[in-house]
Amino acid sequence: MDLADLVDPAHTALCVVECQNGVVGPASSIPAVAAAVADADLLARLGTLAAVARSVGVRVVHCTFRSREDLWGGNRNSRLFAAARKSEVQQVEGTAAVEPVAELGFDADVDVVVSRSHGLSAASGTQLIPLLRNESVATVVVVGVSLNVAVPNTVFDLVNAGFQVVVPTDGSVATDADYGNRVLEHTLAHVSTLTDVTTLAGVWQR
């Protein structure tokens, strides 16, 4: 399928995974991820892509993580979750940590926030898939952090749910850049359509 047809604004949504202050901002619970984001200048690129998406009617969905202040109900079953629980920065609901970073130009009038409090995927056990289906979305563009865990998990769940998924290769990072490139080449390329932010924005602006 031609990329322009695949990402037609009439049936496409842009999902931005965990680009929130407490993850990719200066005060991060995962400093290595925040550093990778800064080194790649990722937020500026995603801010541009989100602005283009809004301008053509593509819904921007911010997929965030949040927890209760007492962390009740959160996962304890992996090293990743254990490290997050020990961090001085917590993604507590109602705090600045769970808000989308300013670079994304969050627009409360049109953007959507879908939060989760458990798991590794923005799509599993959240409202994301039902909301997309209710709006007749067929294609989901997935960007954000990170290629280590959350982005691949989200892509897999969306593909399993029957959506076409598009992944801009410069729209995500991993804590090891070479590893991120391997995930894109050897895994996500087989289950999604790879492109880049500039090409995607150009298609939307035609």
Where does each model-flagged region fall?
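Short beta-strand segments at enzyme active-site cores
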Residues: V58-F65, P168
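Aromatic- and acidic-residue-enriched segments that line the glycan-binding/catalytic groove
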Residues: L71-R85
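Active-site-adjacent betaalpha module
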Residues: M1-A13, V52-V56, F81-R206
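Short glycine-enriched, charge-decorated loop/helix-capping segments at active-site entrances
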Residues: S29-A38
